């Protein structure tokens, strides 16, 4: 059985890890970095760029560079948070036929799981390069507060990337695993405060020793799946835009190129202000008008940044309060606070957390890597390589069905330990009702329409009977991934109907299979592109070396040879500009053939000169013998040293 890798599929950055010889190893990517930007770009020549290479060209290709797509995964286009995002990103967010939020790049509409799959493929390749063997299985992390649609969409992304997703695990739980594995035995309760690039989670986790096993039990979780570092960046971008408008009268909001430069600069300034008291944002030639180019230069202090984002930091405290209340624990009873996610490096965030929980957070957990490390540990548990760990996670939101009067009737309350199964008997609302619609909901509101609709299905052929008589047993079954399976049974006839909740949107199996095939086709295209690039490089190198050889040879090359070589060089240069690898190979061969006689001539000449040069070199030492002075020295022994 191959290795099961752990992947932290982040909004801003992703990370891949593996358990090796009992130790967790974070794997460096091809660029030598331990995290990879979760950015995918579609270049004009059809190449798909992922990670740092995509980030580098974002300024010149803003409409086709997709970032923070995790915030759209499993979301409907009409949702408020999606509508808000449309105004903030330079790429297009469009409405799919099924009502989901999709993205558009290079004129092609794509589902968010397809984009996330490109990042996962990069993570998969990173692990394969390190291990030297194919990787097909993974544990992927999601925010604890992700709903069923978002979890399902993440699993779909894994499938499209060619991965068998063995488990979807909550990010704070993964971080607690990474933290708790090497801690001393005994019970302790920890808070994991996870403020990442696009999402916020907080979990109360009890780490206990039960029958020699490390038991990680999530007592409660809460969060906000649309609050993270990207929002902090936006506050800074808005401030810079306003300052520039005050100074120059020009609005940069409608200039995608300028906004992309501002995004990069804002992120850099935010990071710098975690360690410095002030920084300069200096962007020359940010735009131009009739009077000439305009430059942006704004000094920002840490205090200014903190005033811009203070309310965002405060928004994270209420979920902490709710999580403690749901867990039935007082803040003073928390043993350790673990900070996860790059945004937790901000001093204001650290202070807010310390003030609320009454203790400083631990500094020995890497906020960028802990989640991937925990996922790798869970992978090793599933593979049987780690035996003494038991993970008890929870369902983050209440699950129920719509009943008479548009009411949501809960079946599984939030923070119920998973996997779990719960059944409840319902009946008909009308006399002789022949079918019932089971409308599955997720959320905390009493009014059904105010909750997230996960899907509907019908149980038909109910025998005629007065209202309230038929016995319809509805069963909710949540698996270890937090994904819901729902069944309904007419107790009188034994007739059943069941579904794995796929939401009233989401991707169908056919769509996923098509995307998997597309991804495989892309892999073939990528291979061809690499081969073409190698052929072009070989062609360019041969043109350069041949021209140099002809120049060095001077009049030793005949006019006919020169003409033939130049014609072959021009033909190869033309072929290199094209996309036909076979044509490049043919022209390389042709140039090699016509330049071979000259190369042989040069080689023969060098060989003829070589012995002569060698003889001279050997003669020189002989000539110098008369001048050699023998060194005078005494051997110093033992205590004679001076």
From Swiss-Prot:
Gene3D superfamilies from the UniProt entry: 1.20.1270.10, 3.30.420.40, Actin, Chain A, domain 4 (3.90.640.10), Substrate Binding Domain Of DNAk, Chain A, domain 1 (2.60.34.10)
Region (Disordered): 602-642
Alphabetical keyword list: ATP-binding, Chaperone, Nucleotide-binding, Phosphoprotein, Stress response
Annotated CDD domains: ASKHA_NBD_HSP70_DnaK-like (cd10234)
Sites bearing Phosphothreonine, chain numbering: 199
Induction statement: By stress conditions e.g. heat shock.
Basic and acidic residues bias: start-end ranges: 621-642
GO molecular function, a single term: ATP-dependent protein folding chaperone
Bias-annotated ranges (Low complexity): 604-620
UniProt KW Amino-acid biosynthesis keyword: no
Keyword DNA-binding: no
Family per similarity comment: Belongs to the heat shock protein 70 family.
Task of the protein: Acts as a chaperone.
Protein name, entry field: Chaperone protein DnaK
Gene encoding the protein: dnaK
């Amino acid at each position: 059985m191959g290795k099961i890798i752990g992947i932290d599929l982040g909004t801003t950055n992703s990370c891949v890890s593996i358990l090796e010889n009992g130790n967790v190893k974070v794997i460096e990517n091809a660029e030598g970095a331990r995290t990879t930007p979760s950015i995918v770009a579609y270049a004009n020549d059809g190449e798909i760029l992922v990670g740092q290479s995509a980030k580098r060209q974002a300024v010149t290709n803003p409409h086709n560079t997709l970032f923070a797509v995790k915030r759209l995964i499993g979301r409907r286009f009409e949702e408020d948070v999606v509508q808000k995002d449309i105004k903030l990103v330079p790429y297009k967010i469009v409405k799919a036929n099924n009502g989901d939020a999709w993205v558009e790049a290079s004129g092609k509409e794509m589902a968010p799981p397809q984009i996330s799959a490109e990042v996962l493929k990069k993570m998969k390749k990173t692990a394969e390069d390190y291990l030297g063997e194919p990787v097909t299985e993974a544990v992927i992390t999601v925010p604890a507060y992700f709903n069923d649609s978002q979890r399902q969409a993440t699993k779909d992304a894994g499938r499209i990337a060619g991965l068998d997703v063995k488990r979807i695990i909550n990010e704070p739980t993964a971080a607690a695993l990474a933290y708790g594995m090497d801690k001393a035995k005994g019970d302790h309760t920890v808070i994991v405060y996870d403020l990442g690039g696009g999402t916020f989670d907080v979990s109360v986790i009890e780490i206990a020793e039960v029958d020699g096993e490390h038991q990680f039990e999530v007592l409660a979780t809460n969060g906000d799946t649309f609050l993270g570092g990207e929002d902090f960046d936006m506050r800074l971008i808005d401030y810079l835009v306003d300052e520039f408008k005050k100074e120059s009268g020009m609005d940069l909001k409608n200039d995608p190129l300028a906004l992309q430069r501002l995004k990069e600069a804002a992120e850099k300034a935010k990071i710098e202000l975690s360690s410095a008291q002030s920084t300069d944002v200096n962007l020359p030639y940010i735009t131009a008008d009739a009077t000439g180019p305009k430059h942006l230069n704004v000094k920002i202090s840490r205090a200014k940044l903190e005033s811009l984002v203070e309310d965002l930091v405060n928004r994270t405290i209420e979920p902490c309060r709710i999580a403690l209340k749901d867990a039935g624990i007082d803040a003073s009873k928390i043993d350790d606070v673990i900070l996860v996610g790059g945004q937790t490096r901000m001093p204001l965030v650290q202070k807010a957390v310390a003030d609320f929980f009454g203790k400083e957070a631990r500094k020995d957990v890497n906020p960028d890597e802990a989640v991937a490390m925990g996922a790798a540990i869970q992978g090793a548990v599933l593979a049987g390589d780690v035996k003494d760990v038991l993970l008890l996670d929870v369902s983050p939101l209440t699950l129920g069905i719509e009943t008479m009067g548009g009411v949501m009737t809960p079946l599984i309350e939030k923070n119920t330990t998973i996997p779990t199964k719960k059944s409840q008997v319902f009946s008909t609302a009308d006399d002789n009702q022949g079918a019932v619609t089971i409308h599955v909901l997720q959320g905390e509101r009493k009014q059904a329409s105010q909750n997230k609709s996960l899907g509907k299905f019908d149980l038909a052929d109910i025998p005629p009977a007065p209202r309230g008589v038929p016995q319809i047993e509805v069963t909710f079954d949540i698996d270890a991934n937090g994904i819901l399976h729902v069944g309904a049974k007419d107790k009188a006839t034994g007739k059943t109907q069941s579904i794995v909740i796929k939401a009233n949107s989401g991707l169908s199996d056919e769509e996923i299979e098509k995307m998997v095939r597309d991804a495989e086709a892309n892999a073939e295209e990528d291979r061809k592109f690499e081969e073409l690039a190698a052929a072009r490089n070989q062609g360019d190198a041969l043109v350069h070396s041949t021209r140099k050889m002809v120049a060095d040879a001077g009049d030793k090359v005949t006019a006919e040879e020169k003409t033939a070589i130049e014609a072959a060089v021009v033909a190869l240069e033309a072929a290199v500009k094209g996309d036909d690898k076979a044509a490049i190979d043919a022209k390389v061969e042709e140039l090699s053939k016509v330049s071979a006689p000259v190369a042989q001539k040069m080689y023969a000449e060098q060989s003829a000169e070589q012995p002569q040069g060698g003889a001279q070199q050997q003669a020189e030492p002989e000539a110098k013998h008369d001048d050699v002075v023998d060194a005078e020295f005494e051997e110093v022994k033992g205590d004679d040293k001076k």
